[in-house]
Curated annotation (Swiss-Prot):
Keyword check for Transcription: yes
Keyword Hydrolase part of the UniProt annotation: no
UniProt xrefs under Gene3D superfamilies: Homeodomain-like
All residue ranges annotated as the HTH myb-type domain in the record: 31-85
Main subcellular localisation: nucleus
Name of the protein in question: Protein REVEILLE 2
Knocked-out gene: effects: No effect on the regulation of core clock associated genes or on the hypocotyl length, but hypersensitivity to freezing stress and slightly earlier-flowering phenotype. Rve1 and rve2 double mutant has no alteration in the period or phase of the clock. Rve1, rve2 and rve7 triple mutant has no alteration in the period or phase of the clock.
Role, per record: Positive regulator for cold-responsive gene expression and cold tolerance. Part of a regulatory feedback loop that controls a subset of the circadian outputs and modulates the central oscillator. Negatively self-regulates its own expression.
GO molecular function terms listed in the Swiss-Prot or TrEMBL record: DNA binding; DNA-binding transcription factor activity
Alphabetical UniProt keywords: Biological rhythms, DNA-binding, Nucleus, Transcription, Transcription regulation
Coiled coil: none
Annotated segments matching region Disordered: 134-177
Induction line: Circadian-regulation. Peak of transcript abundance near subjective dawn. Up-regulated transiently by light.
Amino acid sequence: MAMQERCESLCSDELISSSDAFYLKTRKPYTITKQREKWTEAEHEKFVEALKLYGRAWRRIEEHVGTKTAVQIRSHAQKFFTKVARDFGVSSESIEIPPPRPKRKPMHPYPRKLVIPDAKEMVYAELTGSKLIQDEDNRSPTSVLSAHGSDGLGSIGSNSPNSSSAELSSHTEESLSLEAETKQSLKLFGKTFVVGDYNSSMSCDDSEDGKKKLYSETQSLQCSSSTSENAETEVVVSEFKRSERSAFSQLKSSVTEMNNMRGFMPYKKRVKVEENIDNVKLSYPLW
């Protein structure tokens, strides 16, 4: 019995919920406060006259009508044009719908980047007096390149031929200073080394390389040997020319490396190094 009562109560609850689901809700009552805009016959006649005079210039039509805004005139024109197109051939009145206004084309449709030239290019353009020639369509009016080129041409054209040599010297000095600034400096073990450009070093004259070789070859070979802890004697060898593959070049490199060794060294190790230097000198007699 208890089970039957529970089943009946559940069935009755389901029926009540289903009836609530199908129950239609009433719409919330509201009042229309803003009425539809009405056009009088006089306003419509003024509107048609303005259409014939000004076309789709809504601001001028607004001034001509006087009582309606441009937004209201535009919405009224859309309704009027649909009505004229619908009643075409039925009504005797022939009203020409003005064509839509052409869209304005932008002056620069895509953003353009300002190209900043390098310092070397600017110096070269000023020296030669030639500027980069580009099409007017591909160049913006506020271009940095055109401005620099015009300045360089104007300065060269205005100056006299007597002052051309002074200008060239000043420009060369500026270019040299710019190249010196571009060189990189490297600091290793408390010493600064200037790292130059590989291409510029390869493009040097052969005469300079020859001078450097002669200078390095003519340097004297100096060997230092200490006979006591306080006194040191230097042996200066006479100058001579040698080839790069000779044994004397290896001797010089080994001796200079040993002489340039700095820092603390134990006494026994130092004695061995000095003995090695003496042996090297004896094995390669210098004449």
